[in-house]
């Protein structure tokens, strides 16, 4: 164990522990912006600097390890001056129009500026404008980028794609798509991990809420919403709702209060998907000599994009079935439209999904089997739905729980577990077992 002193407190930690982690063990919080444990420990933002007795230079707490007898000051006058100056320099190249930013209230840079009391900048603003296709599901605003490199490291080390890289030099250095390509030309799978790990609003999903509000305001439209299984567990987080209050029944009620005509459960079409994929697997197993194994699910558009971009030789091993969301859209604009006597061209189908890649999937030209229109008109992320709830001034905690509409609102346990890791495979095995044996496993 290594013994040291941090802000007057005795600390004992294992050798190799960073100063940042050592401080955290005794409840001392050192602010960070670029830091991601084990992924991005580069000290680029210089916000986590601390003073070490006997060393003239301030050092980054995130990538410097503890030493025996070290005396650390995390908030000395010297540290406070340097930390504030570093933050002001970052803000000088950052678009601070926070009121129109989707990350307002959930932005690390904004929070740190408030904590340090930075309300005016002593430096002239210098923004680095960079054109971007606003029609792509992933939106990047270079004016909000602070060059923390989080997106680069997550894409490279976790996803293994390396879509992002540094471009240009010196004061013109910025993050951009690797190799000077456009984002459409890259191998981006639209997994959304770079958005999740961006500490500012430099990366976000394309906002499609206006399309839904317009449809709700159109008396000619019949708005149908389907909710993916994973959404029910996450929709209340950004609204600050505890888990026991953020029930799927209250989400259904909130959507109806907005004016949605029918609210269905994507679990229904998850069952359809797994029956299709299970049947396909059994058929392939019966004709082994004609097929290559393993067979992969096709229900995740991010995974499908990955296979086609990075492992195209596996494309023929993907299931031929549509994703649950697309199946649901097709059923809505065919069977359901006929059942209710609704012109399918008047149905506006919205899916609420936990995935940015779904925005790409709904725009694929061949996804229009039912009536020639897109099977699904708009795909919203969980965060977009939460923004709609706030925009409508709906207090979900006051709403009584409501049930899904029928007949597309019921499902088996196989459909429900789609939202969990490994759920699709387990659902497929359960379904195949039932088809072969005639009873549940």
List the predicted regions and their residue ranges.
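Iron-sulfur-associated redox domains of electron-transfer enzymes in respiratory
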Residues: 10, 15-75, 79, 205-441
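Extended, non-catalytic structural segments that build the interaction scaffolds
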Residues: 7-9, 139
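Fe-S ferredoxin-like electron-transfer domains
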Residues: 46-190, 196, 203-218, 222
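Eukaryote-biased recognition of intrinsically disordered, low-complexity regulatory segments
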Residues: 1-7
């Amino acid at each position: 164990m290594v013994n040291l002193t941090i802000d007057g407190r005795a600390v004992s930690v294992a050798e190799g522990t960073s100063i940042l982690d050592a401080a955290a063990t005794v409840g001392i919080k050192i602010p960070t912006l670029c830091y991601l444990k084990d992924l991005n420990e580069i000290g680029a933002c210089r916000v986590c600097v601390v003073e070490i007795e006997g060393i003239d230079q301030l050092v980054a707490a995130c990538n410097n390890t503890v030493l025996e007898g070290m005396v650390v000051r995390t908030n000395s006058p010297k540290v406070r001056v340097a930390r504030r100056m570093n933050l002001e320099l970052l803000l000088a190249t950052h678009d601070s129009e926070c009121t129109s930013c989707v990350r307002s209230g959930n932005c690390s840079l904004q929070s740190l500026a408030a904590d340090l009391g930075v309300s005016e900048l002593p430096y002239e603003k210098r923004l680095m404008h960079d054109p971007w296709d606003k029609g792509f599901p992933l939106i990047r605003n270079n004016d909000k980028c602070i060059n923390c490199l989080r997106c680069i490291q997550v894409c490279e080390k976790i996803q293994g794609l390396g879509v992002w890289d540094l471009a240009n030099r010196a004061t013109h250095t910025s993050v951009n798509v690797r190799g000077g390509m456009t984002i459409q030309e890259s191998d981006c799978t639209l997994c959304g991990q770079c958005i999740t790990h961006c500490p500012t609003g430099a990366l976000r999903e394309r906002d499609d809420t206006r399309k839904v509000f317009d449809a709700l305001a159109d008396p000619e439209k019949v708005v149908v919403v389907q909710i993916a299984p994973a959404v029910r567990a996450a929709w209340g987080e950004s609204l600050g709702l505890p888990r026991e209050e953020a029930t799927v029944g209250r989400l259904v009620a909130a959507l109806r209060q907005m004016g949605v005509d029918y609210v269905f459960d994507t679990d229904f079409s998850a069952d359809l998907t797994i029956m299709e994929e299970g049947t396909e697997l059994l058929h392939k197993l019966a004709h082994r000599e004609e097929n290559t194994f393993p067979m992969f699910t096709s229900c995740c558009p991010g995974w499908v994009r990955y296979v086609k971009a990075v492992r195209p030789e596996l494309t023929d091993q993907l299931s031929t079935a549509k994703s649950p969301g697309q199946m649901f859209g097709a059923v809505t604009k065919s069977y359901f439209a006929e059942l209710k006597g609704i012109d399918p061209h008047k149905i506006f189908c919205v899916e609420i999904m936990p995935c940015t890649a779904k925005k790409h999937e709904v725009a694929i030209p061949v996804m229009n089997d039912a009536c020639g229109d897109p099977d699904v008109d708009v795909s919203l992320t969980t965060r977009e739905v939460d923004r709609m709830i706030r925009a409508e001034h709906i207090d979900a905690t006051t709403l009584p729980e409501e049930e899904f509409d029928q007949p597309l609102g019921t499902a088996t346990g196989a459909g429900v577990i789609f939202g969990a890791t490994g759920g699709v495979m387990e659902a497929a095995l359960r379904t195949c077992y039932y088809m072969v044996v005639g009873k549940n496993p």
